[in-house]
Amino acid sequence: MALIVQKFGGTSVGTVERIEQVAEKVKKFREAGDDVVVVVSAMSGETNRLIGLANQIMEQPVPRELDVMVSTGEQVTIALLSMALIKRGVPAVSYTGNQVRILTDSAHTKARILHIDDTHIRADLKAGRVVVVAGFQGVDGNGNITTLGRGGSDTTGVALAAALKADECQIYTDVDGVYTTDPRVVPQARRLDKITFEEMLEMASLGSKVLQIRAVEFAGKYNVPLRVLHSFQEGPGTLITIDDEEESMEQPIISGIAFNRDEAKLTIRGVPDTPGVAFKILGPISAANVEVDMIVQNVAHDNTTDFTFTVHRNDYLNALEILKQTAANIGAREAIGDTNIAKVSIVGVGMRSHAGVASRMFEALAKESINIQMISTSEIKVSVVIEEKYLELAVRALHTAFELDAPARQGE
């Protein structure tokens, strides 16, 4: 008998019919002897509908009141799923984040989980009940309802699995696992049977939408085995777990190709090359809560420097205005921007033990006449910025160059 936490997203519980299907799936696990805790999101589109109502009252709704409002979406879903289970003869009980005491900080709309009181859940499991918990929400120390931000239901599922020391946390989605890259771009992309927390964290941070990045961080911190599965198709999915050094010797060098279209590039030219120049440029950007990704600094012959960095495209206009003001303040020549870029990355723990991986990447892009504008590396990742129109060509070229189209071979 295993203790399993299952999380179903908004699409998986988007209609009453789908909720009935989820109940059938949960019932099978109970019949197999497993203890099950289910975490569900609001029905697809419901959170946006509720936010729309709030926006009709206030253009910028008060965060505390918005949390009270949007948390009702999950309350509907947990009750419906519990009813569907009880109808099938499966004892079930539903809990909101407040009822199950998912304690968070007080950062409304983006709260972080601090502690979970598992007393009620363990008592219900011992009594043979399936426990259905509302994802995405909790309560702060003053009893205020909080929400965890977009994708927070994944985090709820992982946090519950960690608190309960579950054998596995299963994340059900509209895909049957984690792929080597987006199959819509590369039809030959393969589903991965297994991937490490490190690799998944890199892929999530680089734009992979399969798992929410905070959930992966939480799972890695508390060593919660994650499995990504399709909600309505049978299959083994993808297991996300710790790196097994002996096993990884037989894994391919690269596990996946990630990409992100949501990047923008900013450059400030002719900056006097003096100590502290990076802080003078990035300090005001940071003060505006704009997150900087990749950075490149070039020193010219006339004791000036060109400083380039990337930000999320949503922050582009704000960051460009700040950079223009900074250019005037520090005597730089100009500040310019470019939104026609994209980031492509190769990810794999195999890079640690193999030399020449970056060179192989650059060669593959050069063969397609794709110019690299910026480069960033980590222990298990190499990222490049290229012109956006070449993005899909680059992904396909790299997928082929690292033999991800074909079955992985030992000793690759």
From Swiss-Prot:
Domain of life: Bacteria
GO MF term set: aspartate kinase activity; ATP binding
Tagged with keyword 4Fe-4S: no
Keyword Cell membrane: no
Catalyzed reaction equations: L-aspartate + ATP = 4-phospho-L-aspartate + ADP
Family matches, as InterPro entries: AceGlu_kinase-like_sf, ACT-like_dom_sf, ACT_Aspartokinase, ACT_dom, AKii-LysC-BS, Asp/Glu/Uridylate_kinase, Asp_kin_monofn, Asp_kinase
Enzyme Commission designation: 2.7.2.4
Listed PANTHER family: ASPARTATE KINASE, ASPARTOKINASE
Protein's name according to its UniProt entry: Aspartokinase
GN (gene name): lysC
